[in-house]
Amino acid sequence: MSIIDAVILGIVEGLTEFLPVSSTGHLILTAGLLNLEQTDTLKCFEVVIQLGSILAVVFTFFERLKRDKQLWIKLIIGFLPTAAIGYLLYSHIKSLFSQNVVVYMLIIWGVIFIVVELLRKKNPPENEILTLDGISYKQAFFIGLSQCFAMVPGTSRSGATIIAGLLSGLNRQTAAAFSFLLAVPTMFAATFYDTYKNREIFAANMDNIQLFLLGGFVAFLVALFAIKMFLKFVSRFDYIPFGIYRILIAFAFMFFVL
């Protein structure tokens, strides 16, 4: 992996981690276009750049996270289902990883996004929840439970949680914001658990630490931009463009990678 490869992959991770388009699918597609094989080194690199993206959420919402205890309770409630299922089914989840599965999930969840938005337009929700304060513990649990679907590669963690938020009565911007915040405990836990389970592989790749840190820093900067732009976008528009994009990128995946 070259410096240019590290920068490109960091940009892709930062742009796609919090958009409902599957960062995993985009990283696989990009790696294929760069002629990078799915090696242990690349897997370690992806863990590090994911950490960079998580830190961007912490930075963006730092003041809210620092002072809002109720929000933390909701995030913990949302995190628990994923933590339990992820711990129990870790090996099985990892065995699901395949490029074909990624393509199927890109298409399936793309269609789901389109259908959910069309149904919302036909039957607008009453008493939409407009703020994070309005989210109940029950809704937080339901949204957190939806993260379990995202364990299947190509689903998109943000995609699953945003759809669950919309179905729970949250408006688009609040659904996105809670999805981003829920990533903090979820992705920190996943990152550290992955690092622990693969500690020998990480130790063997310490020669690449500078590339890893470069990619993580790039992902952090790009994710800062992506989070702010995405929240502005969904305050004005719906999620149908993302559903269409997922389907298009699935076909690109089939053409360039499979």
From Swiss-Prot:
Catalyzes the dephosphorylation of undecaprenyl diphosphate (UPP). Confers resistance to bacitracin. The chain crosses the membrane at residues 1-21, 42-62, 71-91, 96-116, 134-154, 173-193, 211-231, 237-257. Its main location: membrane. It is found in: Cell inner membrane. This is Undecaprenyl-diphosphatase. It is an enzyme of class 3 (hydrolase). InterPro entries: UppP (IPR003824). Bacitracin is thought to be involved in the inhibition of peptidoglycan synthesis by sequestering undecaprenyl diphosphate, thereby reducing the pool of lipid carrier available. The lineage of its organism: Bacteria, Pseudomonadati, Campylobacterota, Epsilonproteobacteria, Campylobacterales. Signal peptide: none annotated. GO terms for molecular function: undecaprenyl-diphosphatase activity. It comes from the Bacteria. Coiled coil: none annotated. GO terms for biological process: cell wall organization; peptidoglycan biosynthetic process; regulation of cell shape; response to antibiotic. GO terms for cellular component: plasma membrane. It is a multi-pass membrane protein. Belongs to the UppP family. It catalyses: di-trans,octa-cis-undecaprenyl diphosphate + H2O = di-trans,octa-cis-undecaprenyl phosphate + phosphate + H(+).
